[in-house]
From Swiss-Prot:
Record-given protein name: Probable cell division protein kinase ECU08_0230
Lineage top rank: taxon: Eukaryota
Annotated GO MF terms: ATP binding; cyclin-dependent protein serine/threonine kinase activity; protein serine kinase activity
A biological process term (GO) from this entry: cell division
Enzymatic class: transferase
Record's catalysed reaction(s): L-seryl-[protein] + ATP = O-phospho-L-seryl-[protein] + ADP + H(+); L-threonyl-[protein] + ATP = O-phospho-L-threonyl-[protein] + ADP + H(+)
ATP-binding is among the record's keywords: yes
E.C. number: 2.7.11.22
Limits of the Protein kinase domain: 4-263
Sequence positions that bind ATP: I10, G11, S12, G13, T14, Y15, G16, E17, V18, K33
GO cellular component terms, semicolon-separated: nucleus
Residues the record marks as active site: D121
Family that this chain belongs to: Belongs to the protein kinase superfamily. CMGC Ser/Thr protein kinase family. CDC2/CDKX subfamily.
């Protein structure tokens, strides 16, 4: 660890902390995700999955894993330092075209699903933006590769406000559509700067969803009233937030709409 000069604590979670640091060899700022290792249990399964998934991903809109440092007591994942969380960047750049960021977010999610990865915790706090406007999906601690068939999965994934109704109702066998629901919530929030379903409990969250998105018609009316956006954006949001996951739009279908209306990634 002598290569890195530790700086400020950026965030913390169940297994460890994330620090700002300086790479003394490159002189660049990096982010260090440090995970404490238990003598009896060893490396947490979430860390193993995160490393395995990140190693196979390579995309402009996905955070890259620079290196791993492993000692008896500590596992450190080294990432590029990304300047802003999504909402802070949008707040600082209100005059800029939000659709450019929406496009990048969709491109990142489409790539993940093409690589058989379900993120399972898409939310604004896990989406970062560089100072020159490049969006990066981050924090793959809850992610799963569907190439490894190990259902049932936990339904206690995805932060409450972005959790799909089937997860709220306890589903343990699910696929990419749980990310698509989160994507719809995030796109809405990127445009309005307000969460669509700010529930206080699982029960309250389901009540909010049923009230606002119980049918496509009611949801479309609400979105059209609140958002001054092109029709295709409304269509993407509404179809992402279909209560019936079997009817929910896929990342491939969203990309088709984008390519026709906005341009490819």
């Amino acid at each position: 660890m002598t290569r890195y000069i530790l700086g400020a604590l950026i965030g913390s979670g169940t297994y460890g902390e994330v620090y700002e640091a300086i790479d003394t060899e490159t002189k660049e700022k990096v982010a260090l995700k440090r995970i404490r290792l238990n003598e009896k249990e060893g490396m947490p399964g979430t860390a193993l999955r995160e490393i395995s998934i990140l190693k196979k991903l390579s995309h402009r809109n996905i955070i890259s894993l620079v290196s791993i440092i492993h000692t008896d007591a500590l596992l450190t994942m080294v990432f590029p330092f990304i300047d802003y969380e999504l909402k802070k960047y949008i707040g600082m750049n209100t005059g800029k075209n939000i659709m450019e960021l929406v496009n990048q977010l969709i491109c990142g999610v489409h790539y993940l699903h093409r690589m058989n990865v379900v993120h399972r915790d898409l939310k604004p706090q896990n989406i970062l933006v560089t100072s020159d406007g490049v969006l990066k999906i981050a924090d793959f601690g809850l992610s799963r590769s569907l190439e490894i068939r190990v259902p049932p999965y936990s339904s206690e994934v995805v932060t409450l406000w972005y959790r799909s109704p089937e997860l709220l109702m306890g589903s343990t066998s699910y696929r990419f559509y749980v990310d698509i629901w989160s994507l719809g919530c995030i796109i809405y929030e990127m445009i309005t700067l307000e969460p669509l379903f700010p529930g206080e409990s699982k029960e309250n969250q389901l009540t909010l969803i049923r009230r606002k998105a119980g049918t496509r018609r009611s949801l479309r009316g609400m979105v059209e009233q609140r958002l001054a956006v092109p029709k295709f954006v409304t269509e993407i949001i509404v179809r992402c937030l279909d209560f019936n996951y079997n009817q929910r739009i896929t990342a491939d279908e969203i990309m088709e709409i984008l390519e026709n209306e906005y341009g490819a990634c």
